[in-house]
Amino acid sequence: MARITTEDCTGKISNHFDLTLVAARRARQLENGNTPLVDDVRNNKPTVTALREIAAGHIGTELLTRNK
């Protein structure tokens, strides 16, 4: 599996601050048992999985406006 970088995600969320908030909130959701939206997450930490979901376009800034 290739390494994920923030540059892979900035095409989807251009504001670095929003990117950080979205990734953190999604990682928290994954830690609390939400189902990952990308395949092959067995060795990834929740933060890496969250970034992969953002890079794939599954998660975006709409997560910031939704209720937790």
Curated annotation (Swiss-Prot):
Protein name listed in UniProt: DNA-directed RNA polymerase subunit omega
HAMAP family: RNApol_bact_RpoZ
Naturally occurring in which organism (per UniProt): Neisseria meningitidis serogroup B (strain ATCC BAA-335 / MC58)
A Gene Ontology molecular function term of the record: DNA-directed RNA polymerase activity
UniProt gene name: rpoZ
EC number: 2.7.7.6
Biological role stated in the UniProt entry: Promotes RNA polymerase assembly. Latches the N- and C-terminal regions of the beta' subunit thereby facilitating its interaction with the beta and alpha subunits.
Superkingdom per UniProt: Bacteria
InterPro entries (alphabetical): DNA-dir_RNA_pol_omega, Pol_omega/Rpo6/RPB6, RPB6/omega-like_sf
